[in-house]
């Protein structure tokens, strides 16, 4: 079974859910970003097991918000 976890690794750090597809995890990330009133989001390309969605304006150190989507293969036994 394949699942995709959605985590935020910066100011709003935490796990935001587990989804059945990368597309559903991406849609959820975009909804969180929109609800936090950020207007910009930039996705990296999903490389088969991971992608990032950056949002917000960079701070003084060049850091902005980041959601990460990770692919997990679970053993059904």
List where the protein language model places each region:
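A short, charged, amphipathic alpha-helix used as a generic interaction element across diverse proteins
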Residues: 8-10, 20-43
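Short, solvent-exposed polar/charged micro-motifs at secondary-structure junctions
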Residues: 16-17, 56
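Short aromatic-glycine-(Arg/Gly/Cys) micro-motifs in beta-strand/loop hairpins
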Residues: 1-15, 74
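Short, mixed-charge low-complexity intrinsically disordered segments
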Residues: 31-77
